[in-house]
Amino acid sequence: MTIQSLIVTIGSGGLVGFALGLLGGGGSILATPLLLYVVGVTNPHIAIGTSAVAVSANAYANLIAHAWKGHVWWRSAVIFALVGTLGAFLGSSIGMLIDGQRLLLLFGLLMAMVGLLMLRGRATAPHAEQHQTVLRMCMKTSAVAILTGAASGFFGIGGGFLIVPALIFATRMPTINAIGSSLLAVGTFGLITTLNYARHDLVDWTIAMEFIVGGITGGGLGTLLATRFSASKHLLNRVFGLIVIAVAIYVIWRSWASLVA
């Protein structure tokens, strides 16, 4: 490990953390491309497994801040996280069976979808009472939890862009509570994915720790600037959406070129 590679890895983690802190979501989807094409990880599966470590750590760190502010609806969050772990385990198990370049091609298509969603802006939901019929809430939450957990595990991503609207759909909770509550699931799905990949030696722990250090530093800076640029939040989301789409095109091109070579 050279000083240059250390700086590149921490810097890449810092970019992801900065985007997460500034925009509140979506940034973690850049982790795998950065690990592959900037840090220099050659195995797509190791890149996915390693990014899952960073995603999980950053999510749990942000969960503490949201919980302190009272943004977490714990009943819905716990149900979603626990049930979704089954989906995350199945999704990550299937993902490891797929050829790395084919998985990257699908990942690039997913990135393009996320970029388009960021261009549209985050959906909102009307205010709802927290206390619903327990059976109804559990059934709706469990169903979407398994699906989003599977997608999160399959691609090794946080999946906040999937989990937030899923929680809103299942519980009708306000968006700020969905964001805070989603972090428990994001962290847990990332942890399950990490453990599953680690069983097959598909996690580079050294790079993961360096990436996390950068993510925490960048996240702190992004959070500080978030308030200052709050009036431009929608514009920032759209600009970042364009960046995600551009990276998606590159990922699709690289993976497709490898498949047809």
From Swiss-Prot:
Keywords, ordered alphabetically: Cell membrane, Membrane, Transmembrane, Transmembrane helix, Transport
InterPro entries, alphabetized: TM_pro_TauE-like (IPR002781), TSUP/Inactive_protease-like (IPR051598)
Other known facts: Part of an operon that comprises bigR, blh, XF_0765 and XF_0766.
Subcellular location field: Cell membrane
Pfam families named among the record's database cross-references: TauE
Keyword Transmembrane found: yes
Keyword presence, S-adenosyl-L-methionine: no
Top-level taxon of the source organism: Bacteria
Protein name per Swiss-Prot or TrEMBL: Probable membrane transporter protein XF_0764
An example Gene Ontology CC term for this record: plasma membrane
Membrane topology: Multi-pass membrane protein
Annotated TM spans: 6-26, 29-49, 78-98, 99-119, 150-170, 175-195, 205-225, 239-259
Cystine pairings recorded for this chain: none
Expression induction: Repressed by BigR.
Family to which this protein belongs: Belongs to the 4-toluene sulfonate uptake permease (TSUP) (TC 2.A.102) family.
